[in-house]
Amino acid sequence: MLITNTKQKADGQIESHRKLTERVHAAGGKIAAQIYHAGRETSSAVTGVQPVAPSAVREPSMPETPRELTIPEIHTLVEQFGDCAKRAKAAGFDAVEVHGAHGYLAGAFASPFSNKRSDEYGGTIRNRARFGMEIIRNIKEKCGEDYPVLYRISSVEYVPGGLDIEESKVIARLMEEASADCIHCSQGVYASTHTIIPPSVFPRAGYVEHAAEMKKAVQIPVIAVGRINDVEIAESVLQSKKADLVTMARASLADPELPNKVLKGRGDEVIRCISCLQGCIGENGKGNGIRCLVNPLTGMEDEYDLTPAEKAKQVLVIGGGIAGCEAAISAALKGHKVTLIEKK
């Protein structure tokens, strides 16, 4: 959700988000809103203003140097995070996640890679974590102690002078001290962006050991993430107790029916994410929205009508290439009896 100093604009998001939460709840699901401030991981070309950060240090992958935040501005931002969470609750979200990973503002404060301050928001680990802790406490104050707040952290930033697993474990404990209810264990910053959303050359579930280390540091649940795109691998992570939950984002884009198929014993029918990054990251980066190379319906659901046909027909599809197979699948989903013929 948007963190903004224009209250009217922010309040205007509540109704549109409520439409989403109501549909999720009607299907029996739970939904959390991720709230964040990009900090220095953006540019004036996007926002129209100079980026802000804990220190006036340029992010290596970004074109401009950010402006250092003043103490009063930091206090205002803490309040705005809390206000954003309050709007999320009003919109029907069951929880919020504070994005303190990937070099975004809360994470930038926590990391010595981006925070060079010498006041109460810099220097020691506790000082660097203070911004995130104050955000969590502000949210709890405005939304209630029983309203779940997750905190996302980059366990390892993979940049010189960035967070390592030992410092991140301390930060996770401090967020727990501030009343965070769960730690979402991610990795990387924009300067090491290939680690944030690992491509196919990275091992599956390659960062689970980071989550396992986090579990040793805190008493609250820990979420593992990072190319967990296979049901069996996800289950093995949970059975090993290296994490309490797993994130399967791209896997769910490849097949939104993944949970239902698994629950019905149809795991072998799951459309598997191949970690190609072409449809999800590639197309979204071009401003075309989310797509998926292995599922042509992803992001295009409103443009295709797969409701059952009034009268089932015999359909012959000649050619078993990608297009032919997809045509056969679509026809079958509409209730037709399909024969697929391939020359070879």
Model-derived features: where do they sit?
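Flavin-dependent oxidoreductase catalytic cores
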Residues: M1-I318, I322-V338
